[in-house]
Amino acid sequence: MAITAAQVKELRDRTGAGMMDCKKALTETNGDIELAIDNMRKSGAAKAAKKAGNIAAEGAILIKNGEGFAALLEVNCQTDFVAKDANFLAFANSVLDVASAAKVSIEDLKAQFEETRVALVAKIGENINVRRVEYIDGANLAQYRHGERIGVVVAGEADEETLKHVAMHVAASKPEFVNPEDVPADLVEKEKALQIEIAMNEGKPAEIAEKMVIGRMKKFTGEISLTGQAYIMEPKKTVGAVLKEKGASVSNFIRLEVGEGIAKKEEDFAAEVAAQIAATKG
């Protein structure tokens, strides 16, 4: 299978590894990017593999409470300048109002606002996309927005200040699950197998590797779960420990960040300026 430049670029963006290393890894896996990442982690060639899902688009995250739930909406545009534009934000808030009224699906939101969107694109001169909407249920909800780029809503049993602080923690620390035991078994097994292989590649006997992996797996599930993470307000304690001290709990959370997973075209600024200068001379 011929390896394309696009595949090499994607792997390079996701791992931070060199171009030739990426091409070699893809060749060895017959173009399987996920397997290539695993193999590069084993060999130590992809120390930045966690870069997957970096922000690659502009726009805004908005939040509004409904009856017993909250709606989180992402609307995208092409530049940070337009993301702050009053017309763009008014459009995004109009979509949010409808979403928060009755948990409207993203497909229905897109259809309902398509004409308005097209008119705004013509007016502003940038592509605009109503990308996604998420809903979280709960009688006790707290929200936090970091500017308009990150939005978090946390559901749980706690006082307002505690839940707000937890929402701020989620914004900063990006947990994927509420508790370590919520991490899916297949993800745990995949990581465990990977860690055993890494340990054995370091020259450790199988029985020693197994024991080492127990600690590594506890760290792995803790780092990607909210209650297992070190609390940003009190780094010596986990979020779970702090919640327990307060007699509080978190049942769910949603975190959205502008542009997650969107491939953004890389601009050559120098070439762009040169082209503009050439155009003025023409």
Curated annotation (Swiss-Prot):
Keywords (A to Z) from UniProt: Cytoplasm, Elongation factor, Protein biosynthesis
Residue numbers spanned by region Involved in Mg(2+) ion dislocation from EF-Tu: 79-82
A cellular component term, taken from the record's GO annotations: cytoplasm
CDD domains registered for this protein in UniProt: UBA_EF-Ts (cd14275)
Localization per Swiss-Prot or TrEMBL: Cytoplasm
GO function terms (MF aspect): translation elongation factor activity
InterPro entries linked to this entry: EF-Ts_dimer_sf, Transl_elong_EFTs/EF1B, Transl_elong_EFTs/EF1B_dimer, Transl_elong_Ts_CS, UBA-like_sf
NCBIfam families: tsf
Reported function: Associates with the EF-Tu.GDP complex and induces the exchange of GDP to GTP. It remains bound to the aminoacyl-tRNA.EF-Tu.GTP complex up to the GTP hydrolysis stage on the ribosome.
Family: Belongs to the EF-Ts family.
Name assigned to this protein: Elongation factor Ts
Species for this entry: Shewanella piezotolerans (strain WP3 / JCM 13877)
The gene coding this protein: tsf
